[in-house]
UniProtKB/Swiss-Prot annotation:
Superkingdom of origin: Viruses
Induction: Expressed in the early phase of the viral replicative cycle.
Keywords noted in UniProt: Early protein
Protein name in the entry: Early protein I78R
Length: 78
């Protein structure tokens, strides 16, 4: 039983690490649109309402969803 629990924890750790890598990559892609981001509770979140014409709107939406996942699991951005 402890081995199975350890396996689950390690698997969850891999997923969290992957999410962080993807988020950091998206954040790097969006660095030119930094004016659309704000820091809220230690997380960098898009400013609401989002501008209608953002060149990286799809990337910004994906980043927003990933950061919401972090908030749900009480994880830090970095």
């Amino acid at each position: 039983m402890p081995a199975a629990l350890l396996g689950i924890v390690l698997y969850a750790g891999r997923i969290i690490l992957l999410l962080r890598i993807v988020t950091l990559y998206l954040y790097h892609v969006l660095f030119s649109d930094i004016k659309y981001l704000q820091v809220t509770c230690g997380l960098i979140l898009p400013v609401k309402p989002l501008p209608k014409k953002t060149k990286n709107m799809k990337t910004l939406s994906i980043l927003y969803i990933l950061l919401k996942i972090y908030k749900i699991f009480c994880l830090n951005f970095i």
